[in-house]
Design a protein with these regions (language model features):
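A detector of single, family-specific signature residues
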Residues: 1-196
């Protein structure tokens, strides 16, 4: 019994452990300060981009996401069509077919992984924060003709966000959520189900 009283709760090395924890806490605080400085500089640079305010009008697309997309995309003037950027991001559609076999159409995943990441983050954020993107996501996943899985819907929305960003940067137009909702095909009076 006396051995147990002496062995439990040894205090050897507690001072060294305390010093190590203090050092790690200081490192975390220093890194947080550096991150804040970098984000501040990033936000300033983002505001210098022409038409950035128009793009930031999209709910869910913030300065961090926009900076990530534009950094990976590069100069917009080198692209003649938005499909070139879609292909650069690896979101171009490819069909897996051979001979008489026709496989499913999937995104290629060939291209800039980080651009694809930022576009997907923009899609997730827009679906969470913007009503028009929520409606689109719901429409794509619940439509009667060819409903998409949730991930497929997010990829389609990411491509749509890319097209919106491309159009704003090329033409200088403002973001209009009503144009976005034109994809939703609502049943007309002749297509509406008859109530029995």
């Amino acid at each position: 019994m006396s051995y147990a009283e002496k062995s439990v709760g040894l205090t050897d090395g507690t001072d060294a452990g305390r010093e190590a924890m203090k050092w790690y806490a200081e490192q975390i605080l220093r890194l947080d300060e550096q991150l804040a400085e970098i984000e501040s500089a990033l936000h300033e640079k983002c505001r210098e981009i022409p038409y950035a305010e128009n793009i930031l009008a999209i709910n869910g697309v913030g300065e961090n996401i926009l900076a990530g997309i534009l950094a990976e995309m590069g100069d917009i003037s080198r692209f003649d069509d938005v499909k070139e950027i879609q292909k650069l991001s690896g979101m171009g559609l490819v069909a897996c077919s051979s001979g008489k076999h026709k496989g499913q159409t999937k995104i290629s995943h060939r291209g800039r992984k980080r651009l694809r990441y930022w576009l997907f983050q923009a899609a997730k954020s827009a679906v969470s924060h913007a009503d028009e993107f929520k409606q689109l996501h719901e429409y794509y996943t619940t439509r009667s003709n060819n409903p998409l899985k949730k991930m497929q819907s997010l990829v389609v929305i990411a491509c749509k966000i890319l097209r919106v960003i491309y159009t704003i940067l090329k033409t200088g137009t403002t973001y209009d959520p009503q144009k976005l909702l034109r994809d939703i095909k609502r049943p007309t009076a002749s297509q509406a189900p008859m109530a029995a």
